[in-house]
Amino acid sequence: RSTYEQWLVQCPDFAATLRDCGALYINRKSVRGWGETTAGYSRVIKEGMEGIKAHIHKVLDTLDITRPGDYEKIEYLKAMELAADGISALGHRYAAEARKLAEAEPDEKRRKELLQIAGTCDQVPEKPARTFREAIQSMYIYQTCIFMEQNAASYNPGRMDQYLYPFYKADIEAGRLTEEEAQELLDCLWVKFSEQCLFQDQVTAQFSAGYPMFQNVCCGGVDERGMDAVNDVSYLILQATAEVQLYQPSLSVRYNMAKNPSSFLKKIAEVIKLGTGFPAFHNDEVGIEMLLNKGIPLKEAYNWNPCGCVETNLEGKQRCYTAYADFNLGSAVEFA
């Protein structure tokens, strides 16, 4: 009745024995979704579910159910549309709940906050984000839906400083947002990232208790032209990790010695010095070269991000997974 049951039937007896005694852990990808990807967050923020559904309909118009191979494509696209509707619906449910709470809220300041939340969730993720606040909300509702559907670790927001910066810049210039308010929003987002958890089977829960979600956020590096991509949001992201100091999100930096400023390196060092284990420090040029060696065009390779724990990844284009079985070396010594 499930993928897991199919996997159990095919699992050799010796492997099941080693798993049951704690010597080998092989359940992870059989009991949940795959993860290990950066799932098109920038597109969701820019287009909203409406834009994505419009693209689905455009492709559907080119297909013919009588043409070999098209039936499967049609069913797949209809499933995508259904998922998009579900993501939009969750946003509207949050909006309705915020309005309900606002009606019963005696504190005027909090009531206004709740109404602002309602207005934000009415807009996103169904429609394109218009502000920094809406962009963050759109991304996080989408993230929540991914976990609801997949129940897997390592769904990576990726290069947040790149896709959030245009909204931040526009809001700052229009006077809608201050740097302090933007920092608070990111700090709150960091807290929400740490709320995500998985539903585990007994073996997985015992073997990987405390296993984090590896939601890898990346900042720094270069843009699609190979130029310095560090911006104000890059520093705000580093500061969020410094201020919140929770185990999620996993923060990585791409540092390009030839392109990124020394002030960025100094900020990275200040955060590392706190002892939280973040950010992970990645040589940007090596990451680019790894993708070039896979045949990825240079313009696309410039946009790589560390994924999970950790693989080089391209947003919306790759799923990378480098470890399936975990071996307990201590048990090998004990058995010997």
Where on the chain are the PLM-derived regions?
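Conserved catalytic cores of very large enzyme subunits
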Residues: R1-A79, K109, E113-Q116, T120-A336
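Extended non-globular scaffold/tether segments
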Residues: K78-A89
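Amphipathic, well-ordered alpha-helical segments in soluble domains
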Residues: L90-E97, M160-Y163
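A conserved hydrophobic secondary-structure block that centers on an alpha-helix together
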Residues: L101-K109
